[in-house]
Amino acid sequence: MVEATTTRASDSNQHLNHPVCFVGAGPGASDLLTLRAADRLRQADVLLWTDSLVCPQITALAPDACERIRTSTLTLEEVIPLLIDRQRRGAKVVRLHDGDTALYSAINEQICALNDADIPVEVVPGVSAYQAAAAGLSSELTIPGVVQTIVLGRAGGRTGVPRSEEL
């Protein structure tokens, strides 16, 4: 009897089994995706990505039957309900971001909204452009006795830079 109740409870909460997965696409080349990123793309039922920033070779890893939602013309306020809706329908949802999810990706706002909706998340990092640039130059970014500090920043633009962080 307990087993049946447990089964029904897990059936009614089936959507909790699939977190919304935020995946970093890396610097652009599909062969620079992490193995986990490629795996999540291959398992996706729904893929949301900014089509102006992610190359087609990467999105092509998603199954043919995957629902593909281009988000370059959508606001974050329009994307978040799509994430929630598709995940609650039981889909494996992948939100693909260019670069690395830890840098300039706006995943914080999305994760907060998903947390508020009691939806689990998974974050799969991507290779950052600065890492790919160093590899392309056959170089490393830290050298003992020479440099041990890396500062990442960006110029102000649409997204303002706090005065305390101006270089």
PLM feature segments, named:
Residues 1-127, 131-132:
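Class I S-adenosyl-L-methionine
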Residues 10-12, 37-38, 138-142, 164-167:
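A generic local secondary-structure boundary/capping motif
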Residues 65-75, 143-154:
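Acidic/glycine-enriched edge-of-secondary-structure segments
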Residues 90-97, 140-152:
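A polyampholytic, Gly/Pro-enriched intrinsically disordered region
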Residues 106, 134-136, 162-165:
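Short, well-ordered secondary-structure micro-motifs
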Residues 113-115, 145, 167:
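Acidic/polar active-site rim loop that often engages polyanionic ligands
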Residues 129-141:
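Structured adenosyl-cofactor binding patch, chiefly the S-adenosyl-L-methionine
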Residues 153-167:
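Active-site glycine-rich loop that binds ribose-phosphate moieties when present
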